[in-house]
């Protein structure tokens, strides 16, 4: 069983992979130029890695929770993923990811986003 976790943002999408509920690792983030380009890149990952479970972070709390949840669910619908999708609370994952010692948080390369996705998948499977 393979799972993919997504930390969907407006500029970047953090991505992490879990294999057989034992091994989890962050992948390169997808830099969003537009929705369709980003959706196509994620679709490709879903296919290449033969994903059977998609874990998607939803921000809980905060003033923009409702709007971000709507945007994230719309993006997920563009993936046309016909297997299991699980939405999880991503609150605090970025802060926790900083504890992993990302070398340069000013550099917007998506490493922090993919570490957030890694934390979501790690928590989901209690790794």
UniProtKB/Swiss-Prot annotation:
What are its E.C. numbers?
3.1.-.-
Tell me the compartments it is located in.
Answer: Cytoplasm
Q: Which GO CC terms are listed, alphabetically?
A: cytosol
Query: Which SUPFAM superfamilies does the record associate with it?
Result: Ribonuclease H-like (SSF53098)
GO MF entries: nuclease activity
Q: Which Pfam families match?
A: RuvX
Q: Per the annotation, which location comes first and is thus the protein's main one?
A: cytoplasm
Cited InterPro entries: RNaseH-like_sf, YqgF, YqgF/RNaseH-like_dom, YqgF/RNaseH-like_dom_sf
What biological-process terms (Gene Ontology) are attached?
rRNA 5'-end processing
Which keywords does UniProt give here? Cytoplasm, Hydrolase, Nuclease, Ribosome biogenesis
For this chain, the family text in UniProt reads: Belongs to the YqgF nuclease family.
Q: Which HAMAP family match?
A: Nuclease_YqgF (MF_00651)
Q: What function does the entry list? A: Could be a nuclease involved in processing of the 5'-end of pre-16S rRNA.
Q: What is this protein called?
A: Putative pre-16S rRNA nuclease
- Organism from which the protein derives: Campylobacter jejuni subsp. jejuni serotype O:2 (strain ATCC 700819 / NCTC 11168)
């Amino acid at each position: 069983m393979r799972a993919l976790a997504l930390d969907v943002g407006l500029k970047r999408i953090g991505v992490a992979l879990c294999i057989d509920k034992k091994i989890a690792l962050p992948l390169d983030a997808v830099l969003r130029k537009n929705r369709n380009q980003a959706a196509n890149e994620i679709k490709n990952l879903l296919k290449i890695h033969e994903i059977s479970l998609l874990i998607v972070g939803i921000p809980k709390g905060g003033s923009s929770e409702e709007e971000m949840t709507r945007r994230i669910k719309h993006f997920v619908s563009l993936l046309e993923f016909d297997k299991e999708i699980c939405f999880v609370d991503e609150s605090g994952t970025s802060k926790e990811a900083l504890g992993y010692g990302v070398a340069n948080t000013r550099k917007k390369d998506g490493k922090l986003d993919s570490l957030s996705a890694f934390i979501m998948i790690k928590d989901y499977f209690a790794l």
